Structure formats: C-alpha cells, structure tokens
C-alpha cells in the first residue's frame, strides 16, 4: 500500500511540476515572433473583457457615495454575454499557437482541425460552467466542503484532458485511447490540473479570471513542449471515466458531422 501511495504522490508532483514549467513557454516566446503576437492578442482580449470593466466600476464606486451595484451588474452582464464569442476566438488562437510547434505529428494540421478543436474546447468550457453551477445549487449551502471537493476533482479532469486533447488529436490517438491514458495516469493529470482548477473555483473576481485565462494560454501549449508521459506499467489502480468517454464521444461525433458536411 505504501508503494502505491508513493507512486501516486510521485505522479501528482510530476504533473504539478509540469504545469508550472512556464520557463519553457517563455523561451519559445522569446524566440518566436508569431507566438509572441498571439499571446499578446490573448492578453489584450482579456484586458478588454475583464480588467477594463473592473477598473471602471472600481473607480466609479470610489468616486460616488451612492449605490451603484445595479450599474456594476449591467457591466458584468454585458461582459458575460460577449464572453462566449470571446472564448471561441480565444481557443482558436490557442490552438493556432499549438500548431506552430515543430513537434513530430502523425498527420498534417489543417485549419478545419483548429476550428473543430476550438469548438470542442468552447463546449467543454460551457459544460464545466453549467456543472459547477449545478453543484453549487445542490450542495454549496448544505455541504460546502463536499461541494468544493467534487468541483476540484471534476475540474482537474477537465483541465488536464482539455490541455492534452489537442496533442493527442494531432498525434491521431483515438478517443478511447485518450480516455485510457487519463484513467491510468489520473494522478499525473490531477497534479497537472491542480492550479488551473483552484483558479477556476475562485474565479469570481475579474483579476482572477484574467490570471486564469493567461495561465490557461500557457497550460494548453505546454503539452507540445514537455516530454509526454505514457503509462509504462500499472503503478497504482486506475479510475473509471466511461461517462466522460461517452460525453467526449458525442462531441467528437458532432465534429465529424460538421467536417463531413463541409
């Protein structure tokens, strides 16, 4: 049992360490002008979406004495409405960033691949938002600790799968093999998605949302830079993600229908 626990802790730490290898991304940014422009574009979008409205409302609140919460709600309602469109562009840019690397892939990369993966990423993001809201509605007021624990586990699975899904797609790894990797290396992916999940849980502040989006920009391109981890032997029990496999399968089926229609 102690040997299994040691292997689990080792993989969790390994995944966590890989998720903070920002130095690798910085080296790429320093040497790649195209990548720099895309990251700057993402930062500009986030600044317009979150930082500017926050600065305006904060300044207004500290300037006037009367209640301006209704104005704040209107401002952030507008931000949330256009956020959907922003994230679609945002994920397309992220996938384009991934495509510029010279990692050996099993098939050529097309623009249609980028658009399809961007749509899937957007659907993942929307699905996670709905799931988190449902968990809060059912558990938060009664079992807040349980609510946070469930959200954390789900979010780590989401973030790690979302980040590695692009690489697996371009390596032509089928969906069942992707799920199998996640089931066998769940401890590694738990560590990889830890920071992003904690940010997401506490992303009720514009500054945290801004930080989360910039961090995710790096987290999604890192799998194309770091050494990919594959299960060599079963060092600890795997988990069952068949439900996740079914959901992802439906998304991929929808993308195939879109590709065939074009």
From Swiss-Prot:
The keyword Membrane applies. It is a multi-pass membrane protein. Disulfide bonds: none annotated. The keyword Glycoprotein does not apply. It is found in: Membrane. GO terms for cellular component: membrane. Its main location: membrane. The chain crosses the membrane at residues 42-62, 71-91, 115-135, 145-165, 185-205, 206-226, 235-255. Keywords: Membrane, Transmembrane, Transmembrane helix. This is Uncharacterized protein L211. It comes from Acanthamoeba polyphaga mimivirus (APMV).
């Amino acid at each position: 049992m102690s040997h299994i626990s040691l292997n689990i802790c080792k993989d969790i730490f390994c995944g966590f360490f890989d998720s903070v290898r920002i130095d690798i991304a910085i080296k790429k940014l320093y040497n790649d002008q195209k990548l720099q422009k895309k990251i700057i574009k993402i930062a500009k979008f986030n600044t317009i979406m979150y930082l500017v409205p926050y600065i305006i409302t904060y300044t207004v609140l500290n300037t006037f004495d009367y209640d301006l919460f209704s104005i704040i709600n209107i401002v952030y309602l507008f931000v949330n409405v256009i956020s959907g469109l922003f994230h679609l562009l945002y994920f397309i840019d992220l996938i384009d960033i991934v495509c510029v690397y010279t990692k050996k892939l099993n098939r050529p990369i097309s623009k249609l691949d980028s658009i399809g993966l961007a749509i899937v990423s957007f659907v993942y993001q929307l699905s996670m938002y709905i799931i988190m809201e449902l968990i809060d509605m059912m558990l938060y007021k009664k079992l807040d600790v349980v609510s946070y624990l469930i959200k954390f586990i789900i979010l780590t699975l989401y973030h790690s799968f979302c980040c590695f899904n692009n690489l697996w797609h371009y390596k032509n790894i089928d969906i069942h093999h992707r799920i199998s990797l996640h089931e066998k290396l769940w401890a590694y992916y738990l560590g990889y998605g830890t920071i992003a999940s904690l940010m997401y849980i506490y992303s009720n502040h514009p500054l945290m949302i801004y930080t989360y989006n910039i961090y995710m920009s790096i987290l999604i391109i890192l799998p194309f830079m770091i050494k990919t981890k594959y299960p060599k032997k079963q060092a600890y029990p795997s988990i069952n993600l068949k439900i996740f496999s079914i959901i992802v399968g439906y998304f991929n089926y929808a993308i195939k229908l879109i590709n065939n229609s074009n």
